[in-house]
């Protein structure tokens, strides 16, 4: 598996007057993302402060697999988050947890 840097951006349904946790279906989105983390697919993730974007570091075999993994996210279907970019990433400094099997 390879590492990918994934940028997700706010979609048309994002409500700027609400916090992250106040967006529609927050609990379902959080559960979904936590499951990806527990499975070792999402290694790191969080909002990029001062931007409408989120950075994820994900393990996958291809960019298409990244898209497939994120498709069931409730926030994808609600157009709260969209994938803006999927780029192969090489870790040069530091270490990440070993992938789950």
What are these regions (language model features)?
Residues 1-101:
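Conserved, structured core segments of small domains
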């Amino acid at each position: 598996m390879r590492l990918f840097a994934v940028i997700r951006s706010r979609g048309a349904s994002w409500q700027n007057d609400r916090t992250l946790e106040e967006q529609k279906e927050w609990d379902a989105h959080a559960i979904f993302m936590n499951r990806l983390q527990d499975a070792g697919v999402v290694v790191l993730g969080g909002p990029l402060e001062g931007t409408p974007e989120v950075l994820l570091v994900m393990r996958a075999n291809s960019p298409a697999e990244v898209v497939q993994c994120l498709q069931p996210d409730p926030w994808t279907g609600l157009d709260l988050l969209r994938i803006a970019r999927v780029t192969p990433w090489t870790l040069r400094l530091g270490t990440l947890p070993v992938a789950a099997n």
